[in-house]
From Swiss-Prot:
Source taxonomy: Bacteria, Pseudomonadati, Bacteroidota, Flavobacteriia, Flavobacteriales
The protein's role, per its UniProt record: Catalyzes the reversible transfer of the terminal phosphate group between ATP and AMP. Plays an important role in cellular energy homeostasis and in adenine nucleotide metabolism.
InterPro entries: Adenylat/UMP-CMP_kin, Adenylat_kinase_CS, P-loop_NTPase
Originating species: Flavobacterium johnsoniae (strain ATCC 17061 / DSM 2064 / JCM 8514 / BCRC 14874 / CCUG 350202 / NBRC 14942 / NCIMB 11054 / UW101)
Region (LID): 127-137
Coiled coil: none
GO-annotated molecular function: adenylate kinase activity; ATP binding
Keyword Nucleotide-binding attributed: yes
Gene Ontology biological process terms, A to Z: AMP salvage
Family membership noted in the UniProt record: Belongs to the adenylate kinase family.
Matching Pfam families: ADK (PF00406)
Protein name (record): Adenylate kinase
Entry domain remark: Consists of three domains, a large central CORE domain and two small peripheral domains, NMPbind and LID, which undergo movements during catalysis. The LID domain closes over the site of phosphoryl transfer upon ATP binding. Assembling and dissambling the active center during each catalytic cycle provides an effective means to prevent ATP hydrolysis.
Length: 190
């Protein structure tokens, strides 16, 4: 089983690349955003718990997010592996994932970060915001706040996975095909 954690700042191309990687490697794509939307829309018990925090403008606790992710993993017992997109975002979540995966006889194979200069990513998101309808892609100040949050909470994961020799940085600038080629080169050599 191959399990890839794909991360990078908003606009780095994670969603676009995840589509290619899940097909090429027959992975189950687990997007935290999609999982949250499913649980909220279907008013699941975990969705109800998350909504209480969200309605108060608070971050959903690690335990709730992790429980949603575990539920989703358990729905795919025959998967060839997972592509985690948007999870883990914090050290607590990374540790929770490392505790859970061995219970299904697995572990994180690699963590791949799509890296790109903030100014290029801001331009990408503002451009995407013209057609995506996402309010958080249309406001440069909000985009920069998201980057600050990434730097504070998610960037420390680099050291965590480097210590396990599971971290790979990939240049996220170029055509979609060029970036896909860089990613597959890393995965093919694991």
């Amino acid at each position: 089983m191959i399990n890839i954690v794909l991360f990078g700042k908003p606009g780095a191309g994670k969603g676009t690349q995840a589509e290619f990687l899940k097909e090429k490697y027959n992975l189950t794509h687990l997007s935290t955003g999609d999982i949250f939307r499913f649980n909220l829309k279907n008013d699941t018990e975990l969705g109800k718990q998350a909504r209480v925090f969200m309605d108060n403008g608070e971050l959903v606790p690690c335990e709730v997010t992790t429980a949603m992710l575990i539920d989703e993993v358990k729905k795919h017992p025959d998967s060839a592996g997972f592509l985690f997109d948007g999870y883990p975002r914090t050290l607590d979540q990374a540790e929770a994932l490392d505790k859970f995966l061995p219970t299904i006889g697995s572990s994180v194979t690699a963590t791949i970060a799509l890296e790109a200069d903030d100014e290029i990513l801001v331009k990408r998101l503002l451009e995407r915001g013209k057609t995506s309808g996402r309010a958080d892609d249309q406001d440069e100040e909000k985009i920069r706040v998201r980057y600050q949050e990434y730097n504070e909470k998610t960037a420390p994961l680099i050291g965590y996975y480097k210590d396990q020799n599971k971290f790979y940085a990939v240049d996220g600038i170029g055509t979609i095909e060029q970036i896909t080629e860089r990613l597959t080169s890393v995965i093919d050599n694991l």
